[in-house]
């Protein structure tokens, strides 16, 4: 037979998309063993196979007879023939289909079983198991997306009027709360959308990957609770719930309005700590944000008789919130600002590390001018960071607020206070709860400063008592305290008091006049005294004490509490301890005042007695 030297035939991949690499491998092996010599092509017989199958047959017949190679080639040909028959059969079925539903059914069956026959029982069980398993994996890995998808389906299938009429979402929320300890039949959950036909009260928020709840109203007559939420964003995670961290992870609340009984709220949070289902939902919240909210806090059960406390939250951002560490997590907030009866308060973290680094750098600059500041900055920063890592200081400041607003005189602790203003400044050092320390070593240090102004007192009928009913001081011990506070205002600066009253009177006259003008005058000492020479008031105090804040009493105290005791369930014990510390400091101030008055009286009496003896002595000599 004539042997011809030809080029190696190249079989392109599009001709044999499934098994072309096997044919190419066999061709290259044969050509390598025969030094590039191949047999001439044999004219294929007529067949109905497509061109690519005929080409494959032609190249396969050019190889020598080998049992192993022949078996592999026959298998390849069988696979190609079967796939070609399946493709032609699928095309014929799709051509006979009349509508989209039949074509979708054919394509779905072809993907699952590569045929158009009915599903067998084994195939149905396999498909169902894979479908359920995929939904479970989706629910665990991305719970928020899973719930958002089904909310989208419900909102698309049903009209909003039908959802509001049947109260589908209200029933869903009440079903989630039905097994809680404090939940009862009096709890009302409603939605108040502006347009019931178009507004989605419960819908997915795809941009923030959260669940959006709009216009939610919660009311409970027994708990004296009536709150309205503009909208809430929730993130849920079944993975965290399985790990025991709670189902709800992130919460963003915007626009809370309503009233709330403070004592009932504290009891409600305390009861949640022993509720297993509540802990499963709200055990640990990673990120909590509250913005633009205003709540009227009722501080007693007889809320209709006592005025409410307007508590506004401008911005609150918590890295986490735990029911068993509610107070410490609030004090660990990133930002917390608001107002209490229009008196601003702010909670912020102090920059201890930066201050310490600056102080160390200043000391080193003064010590030596030839100093490498860069290396020392890094060393100081590492040192300070290592020292202050487990602890951080938070400052809480509340501007001057009326005592009647805080209800200091409402309970039995300060029942002798009648009126006045108070400013609170507290530096709180909290041990980092994530540090590797035992629970006994985690503590909180509170350095409290209370500034009282314009206090007015009255003598009570009963002595002040703590929340446990124990007496703080007796009525006899309370008398010097009341005497000191009542005499402190007139004793501190009587001339300034009269001057400030005259100034307020003058300003009131100017303000009531139709021609109003604002004159900003620079404060300075008066060139001439405004008091007549025959006045009995002392002018020296007017020059020595020009400030009008002389009528202020500053109380300081420090308190150390374990983080395990810093809970809402122990809030009365914490307030009792702060009250006792304030009474101790106030008693010291009164004792110093009595000692000073006694010394002044003794000096004045001694001077008067000596002068009288001197005068009588001179008179006797004359």
Curated annotation (Swiss-Prot):
Residues 1-70 form a transit peptide. The chain crosses the membrane at residues 124-144, 602-622. Involved in the organization of the mitochondrial membranes and the global structure of the mitochondria. Also required for mitochondrial distribution and mobility as well as for the maintenance of mitochondrial DNA nucleoids structures. InterPro entries: Mdm31/Mdm32. One of its GO terms (biological process) is intracellular monoatomic ion homeostasis. Coiled coil: none annotated. Disulfide bonds: none annotated. Interacts with MDM31. Participates in a complex of about 175 kDa. Belongs to the MDM31/MDM32 family. Present with 10400 molecules/cell in log phase SD medium. This is Mitochondrial distribution and morphology protein 32. Residues 71-123 are mitochondrial matrix. It comes from the Eukaryota. It holds the Pfam family MDM31_MDM32. Its main location: mitochondrion. It is a multi-pass membrane protein. It is found in: Mitochondrion inner membrane. Residues 145-601 are mitochondrial intermembrane. It comes from Saccharomyces cerevisiae (strain ATCC 204508 / S288c) (Baker's yeast). Keywords: Membrane, Mitochondrion, Mitochondrion inner membrane, Transit peptide, Transmembrane, Transmembrane helix. One of its GO terms (cellular component) is mitochondrial inner membrane.
């Amino acid at each position: 037979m004539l042997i011809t030297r030809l080029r190696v035939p190249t079989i392109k991949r599009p001709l044999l998309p499934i098994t072309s690499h096997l044919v190419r491998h066999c061709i290259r092996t044969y050509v390598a063993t025969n030094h590039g010599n191949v047999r001439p092509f044999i004219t294929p017989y007529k067949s109905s196979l497509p061109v690519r199958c005929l080409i494959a047959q032609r190249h396969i017949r050019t190889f020598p007879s080998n049992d192993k190679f022949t078996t592999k080639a026959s298998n390849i040909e069988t696979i190609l023939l079967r796939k070609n028959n399946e493709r032609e059969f699928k095309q014929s079925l799709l051509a006979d289909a009349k509508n989209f539903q039949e074509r979708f059914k054919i394509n779905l069956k072809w993907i699952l079983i590569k045929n158009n026959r009915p599903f067998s029982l084994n195939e149905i069980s396999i498909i169902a198991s894979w479908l359920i398993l995929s939904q479970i994996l989706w629910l665990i890995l991305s719970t928020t997306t899973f719930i958002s998808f089904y909310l989208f389906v419900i909102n698309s299938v049903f009209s909003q009027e039908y959802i509001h009429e049947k109260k589908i979402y209200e029933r869903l929320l009440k079903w989630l709360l039905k097994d809680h300890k404090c939940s009862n039949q009096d709890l009302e959950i409603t939605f108040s959308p502006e347009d019931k036909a178009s507004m989605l009260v419960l819908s997915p928020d795809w941009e923030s990957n959260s669940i959006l709840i709009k216009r939610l109203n919660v009311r409970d007559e027994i708990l004296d609770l009536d709150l309205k939420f503009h909208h809430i964003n929730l993130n849920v995670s079944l993975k965290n719930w399985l790990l025991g961290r709670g189902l709800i992870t992130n919460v963003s609340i915007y626009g809370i309005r309503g009233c709330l009984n403070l004592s009932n709220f504290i009891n409600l949070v305390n009861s949640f700590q022993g509720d297993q289902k509540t802990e499963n939902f709200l055990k640990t919240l990673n990120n909590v944000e509250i913005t633009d909210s205003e709540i009227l806090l009722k501080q007693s059960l007889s809320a209709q008789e006592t005025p409410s406390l307007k508590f506004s939250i401008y911005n609150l951002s918590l890295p986490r919130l735990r029911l068993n560490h509610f107070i410490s997590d609030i004090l660990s907030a990133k930002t917390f600002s608001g107002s209490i009866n229009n008196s601003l308060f702010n909670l912020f973290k102090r920059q201890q590390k930066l201050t310490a680094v600056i102080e160390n750098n200043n000391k080193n600059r003064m010590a030596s001018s030839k100093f490498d500041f860069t290396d020392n900055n890094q060393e100081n920063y590492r040192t300070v960071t290592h020292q202050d890592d487990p602890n951080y200081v938070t400052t809480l400041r509340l501007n001057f607020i009326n005592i009647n607003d805080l209800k200091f005189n409402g309970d039995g602790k300060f029942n002798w206070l009648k009126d006045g203003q108070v400013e609170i400044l507290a530096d709180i050092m909290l041990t980092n709860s994530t540090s590797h320390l035992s629970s006994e070593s985690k503590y909180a240090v509170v350095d409290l400063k209370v500034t009282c102004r314009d206090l007015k007192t009255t003598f009570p009928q009963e002595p002040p008592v703590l929340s446990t009913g124990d007496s703080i001081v007796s009525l006899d011990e309370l008398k010097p305290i009341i005497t000191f506070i009542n005499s402190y205002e007139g004793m501190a600066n009587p001339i300034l008091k009269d001057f400030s009253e005259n100034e307020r009177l003058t300003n009131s006259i100017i303000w009531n006049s139709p021609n109003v003008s604002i004159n900003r005058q620079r404060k300075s000492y008066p060139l001439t005294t405004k008091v007549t020479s025959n006045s009995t008031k002392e002018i020296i105090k007017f020059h020595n004490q020009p400030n009008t804040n002389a009528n202020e009493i500053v109380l300081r105290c420090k308190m150390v509490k374990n983080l395990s005791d810093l809970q809402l369930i122990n809030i009365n014990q914490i307030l009792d301890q702060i009250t006792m510390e304030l009474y101790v400091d106030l008693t010291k101030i009164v004792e110093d005042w009595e000692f000073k008055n006694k010394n002044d009286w003794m000096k004045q009496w001694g001077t008067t007695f000596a002068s009288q003896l001197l005068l009588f002595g001179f008179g006797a000599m004359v």
